[in-house]
Amino acid sequence: CTLFAPYEGEESFEELNTNEDVQKYFKKIFPDLVPLIPDLCEQFFSNPTSSMAIMRTYPWHVDDKSILIGDAAHATVPFYGQGMNAGFEDCRILDELLDKHNNNFKTCFKEYSQVRKPNGDGVQDLSMHNFIVMRDKTADIKFLLQKKIEQKFAQQYPEKWVPLYSMVSFSNIPYSEAWQVGMKQEKMMQSIMNISNINETWDSEEIMEKMLGLI
């Protein structure tokens, strides 16, 4: 498993210096995990603590001389599992642009920077959003109910609702577009979740009709 925690402050890596510190921390934060890892302290201190970062830069090219691709252009945190895919997509788009512009590097590289920058930002936004979801919401009853409603609506009206995860992972929809659509969906779902008796009526056609009316 991987531990994500701040470097400094309360309950941070800087406080985990001895076996006693580690045992105390894990018993407090992850009590059900401790019995499953008898060599917890040994594993903790034998694995390096490393940082995660998001890097945003522009432009991604220098005339017709060089371009940035993948992590060199849009390094991101790993919480959507899309870093390598985004890099491969850079390559696909670059290849398409080389064909489009008959290998005119200067024109191609300029357009590459313009069209890929929003999607580099998009995959970073998606990654940070998913971190918050995994950290705060996966055990939240209301959030889980929201996902049930979304799933039912997507099954009934697949042409009107594609879940954000599906847009990102199983289509060629640009990251920036998926992010924008996902945020519109989230805003719509907040209206649905604010219905006073949603816990009782979530599985009804009435709710499905209300969602249709919001699209």
Positions of predicted regions on the chain:
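FAD-binding beta-loop-beta segment adjacent to the flavin cofactor pocket
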Residues: 50-68, 121, 139, 143
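Active-site flanking residues adjacent to catalytic metal/cofactor-binding acidic residues
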Residues: 69-71, 89
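A short, flexible beta-alpha/helix-coil linker loop
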Residues: 6-10, 74-75, 130
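Hydrophobic/aromatic residues within well-ordered alpha-helical segments
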Residues: 22, 26, 90, 116-119
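Conserved FAD/dinucleotide-binding core of flavoprotein oxidoreductases
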Residues: 1-54, 101-103
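Glycine-rich phosphate/pyrophosphate-binding beta-alpha loops
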Residues: 51-57, 73-85, 118
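A short alpha/beta connector and helix-capping loop motif
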Residues: 80-97
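C-terminal helical "tail/cap" subdomain of flavin- and related membrane-associated enzymes
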Residues: 96-215
